[in-house]
From Swiss-Prot:
Known function: Binds to core histones and functions in the ATP-facilitated assembly of approximately regularly spaced nucleosomal arrays. May participate in parallel with other histone-binding proteins such as NAP-1.
Start and end residues of each stretch annotated as Disordered: 109-152
Source superkingdom: Eukaryota
Subunit structure: Decamer formed by two pentameric rings associated in a head-to-head fashion.
Name of this protein: Nucleoplasmin-like protein
Composition skew (Basic and acidic residues), residue ranges: 136-145
Record family assignment: Belongs to the nucleoplasmin family.
MF (Gene Ontology): chromatin binding; histone binding; RNA binding
Signal sequence, start to end: none
Gene that encodes the chain: Nlp
């Protein structure tokens, strides 16, 4: 069973960046799940507030929320960050912007998903080859029978 805890941070003009990092002392899989990003009630009217995420492990640096008082006060990105340090930064606006979600520590060891995907692809390719061969054989048999039936 996984250990789950609440994660919440506030970004403002004075404190515009926060970083979440995996617990090095925890040997099993960890992930951060961001469920919602909210614009605070004190936010200035007609000011865009843009939150950017940066994951150095995957070289990702992209805005994940654009909020504006009077228009969009909340987004539900439902994004997950596995085994990677993540930095959230308020790159435009003065906030406050609230980010919350879950920090999940698995009891099961994390397996490299890319290796599993490659193994699955190979197995699927092998399965796909056999039906195609059977179909060709069946079609060839049908074709011969059809010609023989026409000659009679």
């Amino acid at each position: 069973m996984a250990e789950e805890s609440f994660y919440g941070v506030t970004l403002t003009a004075e404190s515009d960046s926060v970083t979440w990092d995996v617990d090095e002392d925890y040997a099993r899989g960890q992930k951060l799940v961001i469920k919602q990003i909210l614009l605070g009630a004190e936010a200035k009217e007609n000011e865009f507030n843009v939150v950017e995420v940066n994951t150095p492990k995957d070289s990702v640096q992209i805005p994940i929320a654009v909020l504006k008082a009077g228009e969009t006060r909340a987004v539900n990105p439902d994004v997950e960050f596995y085994e990677s340090k993540v930095t959230f930064k308020l790159i435009k606006g003065s906030g406050p912007v609230y980010i919350h979600g879950h920090n999940i520590k698995d009891d099961v060891e994390v397996v490299d998903m890319e290796e599993d995907d490659e193994e699955d692809d190979v197995a699927e390719d092998e399965e796909d080859e056999h039906p195609k061969k059977r179909a060709k054989i069946e079609n060839a048999a049908d074709g011969k029978n059809a010609k023989n039936n026409k000659k009679k």
